[in-house]
Amino acid sequence: MDVMNFLLNLVVPPAGLLMLAFAWPSLAFFRACEWALRIIYGEDMEGKVVIITGASSGIGEQIAYQYAKRRANLVLVARREHRLRSIREKARTLGAKNVLVIAADVVKEEDCKRFIDETINQYGHLDHLVNNAGLGHSFLFEEASDTSGFAHMMDINFWGSVYPTFFALPHLRRRNGRIIVNASVEGWLPMPRMSLYNAAKAAVVSFYETLRIEIGGAIDITIATPGWIESDMTRGRFMTEEGEVLFKEEPREMYVGPYPVAYTEECARTIVSGACKGQRYVRFPMWYNVFFLYRVFVPDLLDWTYRLLFLNHFITTASKDHTLHDFKGARKKLLITPTSLQLLHHQQHQSPKSSE
Protein backbone atom coordinates (compact mmCIF):
# COMPACT_ATOMS: atom_id res chain seq x y z
CA MET A 1 0.00 0.00 0.00
CA ASP A 2 1.38 3.45 -0.89
CA VAL A 3 2.13 5.95 1.86
CA MET A 4 -0.64 8.41 0.91
CA ASN A 5 -3.45 5.85 1.12
CA PHE A 6 -1.96 4.46 4.34
CA LEU A 7 -2.13 7.93 5.91
CA LEU A 8 -5.65 8.53 4.58
CA ASN A 9 -6.80 5.24 6.09
CA LEU A 10 -5.57 6.46 9.46
CA VAL A 11 -6.84 10.04 9.27
CA VAL A 12 -10.07 10.11 7.22
CA PRO A 13 -12.34 7.76 9.28
CA PRO A 14 -11.89 9.52 12.68
CA ALA A 15 -11.85 12.97 11.07
CA GLY A 16 -15.00 12.20 9.12
CA LEU A 17 -16.85 10.97 12.21
CA LEU A 18 -15.75 14.05 14.14
CA MET A 19 -17.02 16.37 11.40
CA LEU A 20 -20.32 14.48 11.28
CA ALA A 21 -20.76 14.85 15.04
CA PHE A 22 -20.33 18.63 14.77
CA ALA A 23 -22.40 19.06 11.60
CA TRP A 24 -25.35 16.81 12.45
CA PRO A 25 -27.18 19.11 14.95
CA SER A 26 -27.11 22.07 12.55
CA LEU A 27 -28.08 19.89 9.62
CA ALA A 28 -30.99 18.42 11.57
CA PHE A 29 -32.21 21.91 12.48
CA PHE A 30 -32.09 23.17 8.90
CA ARG A 31 -33.85 20.04 7.67
CA ALA A 32 -36.61 20.54 10.23
CA CYS A 33 -37.08 24.14 9.08
CA GLU A 34 -37.08 23.04 5.45
CA TRP A 35 -39.68 20.36 6.21
CA ALA A 36 -41.93 22.91 7.96
CA LEU A 37 -41.71 25.33 5.03
CA ARG A 38 -42.56 22.57 2.56
CA ILE A 39 -45.62 21.64 4.57
CA ILE A 40 -46.83 25.25 4.45
CA TYR A 41 -45.73 26.17 0.92
CA GLY A 42 -46.28 23.16 -1.32
CA GLU A 43 -46.08 23.59 -5.09
CA ASP A 44 -49.33 24.71 -6.70
CA MET A 45 -49.89 22.42 -9.70
CA GLU A 46 -52.91 24.20 -11.18
CA GLY A 47 -52.34 24.71 -14.90
CA LYS A 48 -48.91 23.07 -14.83
CA VAL A 49 -47.97 20.30 -17.27
CA VAL A 50 -47.21 16.77 -16.07
CA ILE A 51 -46.09 13.77 -18.14
CA ILE A 52 -46.75 10.35 -16.59
CA THR A 53 -45.35 7.19 -18.16
CA GLY A 54 -46.84 3.80 -17.37
CA ALA A 55 -50.13 5.61 -16.79
CA SER A 56 -52.49 2.87 -17.98
CA SER A 57 -52.73 1.04 -14.64
CA GLY A 58 -51.46 0.73 -11.09
CA ILE A 59 -49.40 3.49 -9.53
CA GLY A 60 -49.17 5.47 -12.77
CA GLU A 61 -52.96 5.61 -13.14
CA GLN A 62 -53.45 6.74 -9.56
CA ILE A 63 -50.68 9.35 -9.86
CA ALA A 64 -52.63 10.77 -12.82
CA TYR A 65 -55.73 11.08 -10.63
CA GLN A 66 -53.77 12.80 -7.87
CA TYR A 67 -52.41 15.41 -10.27
CA ALA A 68 -55.90 15.77 -11.75
CA LYS A 69 -57.22 16.70 -8.31
CA ARG A 70 -54.57 19.42 -8.24
CA ARG A 71 -55.95 20.74 -11.57
CA ALA A 72 -52.81 20.05 -13.60
CA ASN A 73 -52.61 19.51 -17.36
CA LEU A 74 -51.79 15.86 -17.96
CA VAL A 75 -49.96 13.84 -20.60
CA LEU A 76 -50.68 10.13 -20.16
CA VAL A 77 -48.19 7.77 -21.80
CA ALA A 78 -48.45 3.98 -22.14
CA ARG A 79 -48.75 1.32 -24.80
CA ARG A 80 -52.43 0.54 -24.05
CA GLU A 81 -54.15 3.54 -25.60
CA HIS A 82 -57.66 2.19 -24.95
CA ARG A 83 -56.92 2.15 -21.22
CA LEU A 84 -55.55 5.67 -21.34
CA ARG A 85 -58.78 6.96 -22.87
CA SER A 86 -60.89 5.76 -19.94
CA ILE A 87 -58.35 7.16 -17.48
CA ARG A 88 -58.47 10.48 -19.35
CA GLU A 89 -62.23 10.75 -18.79
CA LYS A 90 -61.95 10.07 -15.08
CA ALA A 91 -59.04 12.52 -14.75
CA ARG A 92 -61.19 15.22 -16.33
CA THR A 93 -64.00 14.61 -13.87
CA LEU A 94 -61.50 14.89 -11.01
CA GLY A 95 -60.34 18.33 -12.14
CA ALA A 96 -57.63 17.96 -14.79
CA LYS A 97 -57.80 20.96 -17.11
CA ASN A 98 -56.53 19.19 -20.21
CA VAL A 99 -55.49 15.58 -20.77
CA LEU A 100 -53.37 14.43 -23.71
CA VAL A 101 -53.17 10.69 -24.41
CA ILE A 102 -50.11 9.33 -26.24
CA ALA A 103 -49.53 5.68 -27.10
CA ALA A 104 -45.80 5.05 -26.80
CA ASP A 105 -43.27 2.46 -25.66
CA VAL A 106 -40.62 3.85 -23.30
CA VAL A 107 -38.07 1.25 -24.39
CA LYS A 108 -37.99 2.94 -27.81
CA GLU A 109 -35.88 6.06 -27.90
CA GLU A 110 -37.83 7.55 -30.80
CA ASP A 111 -41.12 7.11 -28.93
CA CYS A 112 -39.72 8.94 -25.91
CA LYS A 113 -38.59 11.86 -28.05
CA ARG A 114 -41.99 11.89 -29.75
CA PHE A 115 -44.11 12.18 -26.62
CA ILE A 116 -41.86 14.90 -25.20
CA ASP A 117 -42.13 16.82 -28.49
CA GLU A 118 -45.91 16.35 -28.64
CA THR A 119 -46.21 17.66 -25.09
CA ILE A 120 -44.28 20.82 -25.93
CA ASN A 121 -46.27 21.29 -29.14
CA GLN A 122 -49.52 20.97 -27.19
CA TYR A 123 -48.73 22.97 -24.05
CA GLY A 124 -45.55 24.88 -24.81
CA HIS A 125 -43.72 23.79 -21.65
CA LEU A 126 -43.20 20.96 -19.15
CA ASP A 127 -43.17 21.13 -15.34
CA HIS A 128 -43.13 17.56 -13.99
CA LEU A 129 -41.92 14.34 -15.60
CA VAL A 130 -43.07 11.18 -13.81
CA ASN A 131 -41.09 8.11 -14.87
CA ASN A 132 -43.20 5.21 -13.68
CA ALA A 133 -43.17 2.44 -16.31
CA GLY A 134 -41.71 -0.86 -15.15
CA LEU A 135 -41.85 -4.66 -15.34
CA GLY A 136 -40.87 -7.28 -12.75
CA HIS A 137 -39.93 -10.93 -12.89
CA SER A 138 -40.18 -13.83 -10.47
CA PHE A 139 -37.52 -16.46 -11.03
CA LEU A 140 -34.11 -17.26 -9.67
CA PHE A 141 -31.29 -16.10 -11.91
CA GLU A 142 -30.18 -19.71 -12.44
CA GLU A 143 -33.70 -20.70 -13.53
CA ALA A 144 -33.60 -18.55 -16.67
CA SER A 145 -33.62 -20.77 -19.76
CA ASP A 146 -31.54 -18.24 -21.71
CA THR A 147 -30.53 -14.58 -21.68
CA SER A 148 -33.01 -13.38 -24.32
CA GLY A 149 -35.17 -11.45 -21.85
CA PHE A 150 -32.38 -9.89 -19.81
CA ALA A 151 -31.95 -6.80 -21.96
CA HIS A 152 -35.69 -6.07 -21.94
CA MET A 153 -35.68 -5.89 -18.14
CA MET A 154 -33.00 -3.23 -18.26
CA ASP A 155 -34.68 -1.48 -21.20
CA ILE A 156 -38.01 -0.91 -19.50
CA ASN A 157 -36.84 -0.45 -15.91
CA PHE A 158 -33.75 1.69 -16.56
CA TRP A 159 -33.64 3.09 -20.08
CA GLY A 160 -37.41 3.56 -19.93
CA SER A 161 -36.75 6.33 -17.39
CA VAL A 162 -33.46 7.63 -18.78
CA TYR A 163 -34.67 8.20 -22.36
CA PRO A 164 -37.61 10.48 -21.41
CA THR A 165 -35.38 12.31 -18.94
CA PHE A 166 -32.78 13.03 -21.61
CA PHE A 167 -35.29 14.60 -23.98
CA ALA A 168 -37.18 16.44 -21.22
CA LEU A 169 -34.22 18.07 -19.46
CA PRO A 170 -34.02 21.27 -21.57
CA HIS A 171 -37.74 21.92 -21.12
CA LEU A 172 -37.69 21.15 -17.39
CA ARG A 173 -34.69 23.41 -16.90
CA ARG A 174 -36.56 26.37 -18.41
CA ARG A 175 -39.36 25.92 -15.86
CA ASN A 176 -37.26 24.86 -12.85
CA GLY A 177 -39.25 21.66 -13.09
CA ARG A 178 -39.14 18.34 -11.31
CA ILE A 179 -38.45 14.70 -12.18
CA ILE A 180 -40.27 12.03 -10.20
CA VAL A 181 -39.03 8.48 -10.68
CA ASN A 182 -40.49 5.24 -9.35
CA ALA A 183 -37.33 3.40 -8.31
CA SER A 184 -39.13 0.82 -6.15
CA VAL A 185 -37.93 -0.40 -2.77
CA GLU A 186 -35.97 -3.07 -4.67
CA GLY A 187 -33.61 -0.30 -5.72
CA TRP A 188 -31.87 -0.76 -2.37
CA LEU A 189 -33.47 -3.94 -0.97
CA PRO A 190 -32.13 -7.21 -2.46
CA MET A 191 -35.41 -9.10 -2.93
CA PRO A 192 -34.86 -12.75 -3.98
CA ARG A 193 -36.22 -13.96 -7.33
CA MET A 194 -35.82 -10.45 -8.76
CA SER A 195 -32.10 -10.09 -9.38
CA LEU A 196 -32.45 -8.42 -12.79
CA TYR A 197 -35.25 -6.09 -11.67
CA ASN A 198 -33.33 -5.17 -8.52
CA ALA A 199 -30.22 -4.37 -10.54
CA ALA A 200 -32.16 -2.15 -12.93
CA LYS A 201 -33.84 -0.24 -10.09
CA ALA A 202 -30.53 0.14 -8.25
CA ALA A 203 -29.15 1.66 -11.44
CA VAL A 204 -32.13 4.04 -11.51
CA VAL A 205 -31.43 5.22 -7.97
CA SER A 206 -27.73 5.72 -8.69
CA PHE A 207 -28.42 7.51 -11.98
CA TYR A 208 -30.85 10.05 -10.51
CA GLU A 209 -28.76 10.68 -7.40
CA THR A 210 -25.82 11.46 -9.68
CA LEU A 211 -27.98 13.55 -12.02
CA ARG A 212 -29.22 15.56 -9.04
CA ILE A 213 -25.62 16.56 -8.30
CA GLU A 214 -24.80 17.30 -11.93
CA ILE A 215 -27.73 19.63 -12.60
CA GLY A 216 -27.65 21.33 -9.20
CA GLY A 217 -30.83 23.20 -8.26
CA ALA A 218 -32.02 23.84 -11.81
CA ILE A 219 -34.26 20.76 -11.75
CA ASP A 220 -35.45 19.00 -8.62
CA ILE A 221 -35.58 15.21 -8.43
CA THR A 222 -37.83 13.07 -6.25
CA ILE A 223 -36.95 9.38 -5.99
CA ALA A 224 -39.90 7.26 -4.89
CA THR A 225 -39.25 3.79 -3.45
CA PRO A 226 -42.64 2.16 -2.88
CA GLY A 227 -42.87 -1.34 -1.46
CA TRP A 228 -45.56 -3.88 -2.32
CA ILE A 229 -48.44 -1.94 -3.88
CA GLU A 230 -51.55 -3.32 -5.61
CA SER A 231 -50.65 -3.23 -9.30
CA ASP A 232 -50.18 -5.44 -12.34
CA MET A 233 -47.07 -6.87 -10.70
CA THR A 234 -48.81 -7.88 -7.48
CA ARG A 235 -51.62 -9.31 -9.60
CA GLY A 236 -49.11 -11.60 -11.29
CA ARG A 237 -47.75 -9.76 -14.36
CA PHE A 238 -44.13 -10.87 -14.69
CA MET A 239 -41.51 -11.79 -17.21
CA THR A 240 -41.06 -15.57 -17.08
CA GLU A 241 -37.85 -17.58 -17.24
CA GLU A 242 -38.38 -17.87 -21.01
CA GLY A 243 -38.58 -14.08 -21.46
CA GLU A 244 -42.36 -13.94 -21.99
CA VAL A 245 -44.56 -11.38 -20.21
CA LEU A 246 -47.56 -13.17 -18.68
CA PHE A 247 -50.14 -12.95 -15.92
CA LYS A 248 -49.58 -15.96 -13.67
CA GLU A 249 -50.84 -16.55 -10.14
CA GLU A 250 -48.06 -18.93 -9.14
CA PRO A 251 -45.11 -16.52 -9.41
CA ARG A 252 -47.18 -13.77 -7.80
CA GLU A 253 -47.60 -15.90 -4.67
CA MET A 254 -43.94 -16.95 -4.67
CA TYR A 255 -42.86 -13.34 -5.18
CA VAL A 256 -45.14 -11.41 -2.83
CA GLY A 257 -45.21 -14.15 -0.21
CA PRO A 258 -46.40 -13.01 3.23
CA TYR A 259 -45.79 -9.30 2.58
CA PRO A 260 -48.78 -6.97 3.10
CA VAL A 261 -49.80 -5.17 -0.08
CA ALA A 262 -50.71 -1.48 0.25
CA TYR A 263 -53.37 0.47 -1.62
CA THR A 264 -52.30 2.15 -4.84
CA GLU A 265 -54.27 5.33 -4.22
CA GLU A 266 -52.58 5.94 -0.89
CA CYS A 267 -49.17 5.30 -2.43
CA ALA A 268 -49.82 7.70 -5.31
CA ARG A 269 -51.12 10.38 -2.94
CA THR A 270 -47.94 10.09 -0.88
CA ILE A 271 -45.69 10.31 -3.96
CA VAL A 272 -47.43 13.35 -5.48
CA SER A 273 -47.69 15.12 -2.15
CA GLY A 274 -44.00 14.48 -1.47
CA ALA A 275 -43.01 15.73 -4.91
CA CYS A 276 -45.05 18.92 -4.53
CA LYS A 277 -43.41 19.51 -1.16
CA GLY A 278 -39.97 19.16 -2.72
CA GLN A 279 -38.94 15.95 -1.00
CA ARG A 280 -35.81 14.27 -2.33
CA TYR A 281 -37.06 10.79 -1.41
CA VAL A 282 -40.53 9.37 -0.87
CA ARG A 283 -40.74 6.03 0.91
CA PHE A 284 -44.01 4.13 1.17
CA PRO A 285 -44.91 2.38 3.39
CA MET A 286 -42.56 3.86 5.96
CA TRP A 287 -42.01 0.58 7.80
CA TYR A 288 -39.72 -0.58 4.98
CA ASN A 289 -37.09 1.81 6.38
CA VAL A 290 -36.19 -0.73 9.05
CA PHE A 291 -34.80 -2.98 6.31
CA PHE A 292 -32.39 -0.21 5.33
CA LEU A 293 -30.93 -0.36 8.84
CA TYR A 294 -30.65 -4.13 8.50
CA ARG A 295 -28.90 -3.69 5.16
CA VAL A 296 -26.31 -1.36 6.68
CA PHE A 297 -25.72 -2.88 10.12
CA VAL A 298 -26.73 -6.57 9.96
CA PRO A 299 -26.75 -7.65 6.29
CA ASP A 300 -26.29 -11.31 7.25
CA LEU A 301 -29.54 -11.25 9.22
CA LEU A 302 -31.36 -9.69 6.25
CA ASP A 303 -30.02 -12.42 3.96
CA TRP A 304 -31.17 -15.13 6.38
CA THR A 305 -34.64 -13.57 6.68
CA TYR A 306 -35.13 -13.49 2.92
CA ARG A 307 -34.00 -17.07 2.53
CA LEU A 308 -36.54 -18.07 5.14
CA LEU A 309 -39.39 -16.13 3.55
CA PHE A 310 -38.79 -16.73 -0.14
CA LEU A 311 -36.42 -19.61 -0.76
CA ASN A 312 -37.42 -22.39 1.62
CA HIS A 313 -39.18 -25.64 0.83
CA PHE A 314 -42.57 -24.47 2.11
CA ILE A 315 -42.88 -21.63 -0.37
CA THR A 316 -41.72 -23.73 -3.30
CA THR A 317 -44.22 -26.48 -2.50
CA ALA A 318 -47.09 -24.14 -1.68
CA SER A 319 -46.71 -22.06 -4.82
CA LYS A 320 -46.99 -25.15 -7.00
CA ASP A 321 -50.29 -26.04 -5.35
CA HIS A 322 -51.72 -22.48 -5.33
CA THR A 323 -51.84 -22.66 -1.51
CA LEU A 324 -49.27 -20.16 -0.35
CA HIS A 325 -51.89 -18.38 1.75
CA ASP A 326 -52.06 -21.50 3.95
CA PHE A 327 -48.36 -21.98 4.72
CA LYS A 328 -47.07 -21.23 8.19
CA GLY A 329 -46.60 -17.50 8.78
CA ALA A 330 -48.90 -16.40 5.94
CA ARG A 331 -52.21 -17.94 7.01
CA LYS A 332 -53.79 -14.50 7.37
CA LYS A 333 -52.45 -13.16 4.09
CA LEU A 334 -55.84 -12.07 2.77
CA LEU A 335 -56.41 -9.93 5.85
CA ILE A 336 -53.50 -7.68 4.84
CA THR A 337 -54.29 -7.57 1.13
CA PRO A 338 -56.18 -4.75 -0.67
CA THR A 339 -59.73 -5.46 -1.79
CA SER A 340 -58.86 -5.66 -5.48
CA LEU A 341 -56.31 -8.40 -4.84
CA GLN A 342 -58.65 -10.26 -2.49
CA LEU A 343 -61.25 -10.37 -5.29
CA LEU A 344 -58.65 -11.58 -7.79
CA HIS A 345 -57.50 -14.27 -5.38
CA HIS A 346 -61.10 -15.42 -4.77
CA GLN A 347 -61.87 -15.63 -8.49
CA GLN A 348 -58.72 -17.61 -9.24
CA HIS A 349 -59.22 -20.11 -6.45
CA GLN A 350 -62.96 -20.56 -7.01
CA SER A 351 -62.66 -21.19 -10.78
CA PRO A 352 -63.75 -24.68 -11.93
CA LYS A 353 -60.94 -27.18 -12.39
CA SER A 354 -61.97 -27.75 -16.00
CA SER A 355 -60.79 -24.24 -16.84
CA GLU A 356 -57.32 -24.71 -15.41
Curated annotation (Swiss-Prot):
Give a single Pfam family match: adh_short
Q: Which SUPFAM superfamilies match?
A: NAD(P)-binding Rossmann-fold domains (SSF51735)
Q: Which GO terms describe its molecular function?
A: 11-beta-hydroxysteroid dehydrogenase (NADP+) activity; estradiol 17-beta-dehydrogenase [NAD(P)+] activity
Family membership, please give it: Belongs to the short-chain dehydrogenases/reductases (SDR) family.
Entry remark concerning the domains of this protein = The proline-knob motif may be involved in the targeting to oil bodies.
Explain the purpose of this protein: Has dehydrogenase activity against corticosterone (11 beta-hydroxysteroid) and estradiol (17 beta-hydroxysteroid) in the presence of NADP(+). May be involved in signal transduction regulated by various sterols.
- This chain's protein is named 11-beta-hydroxysteroid dehydrogenase
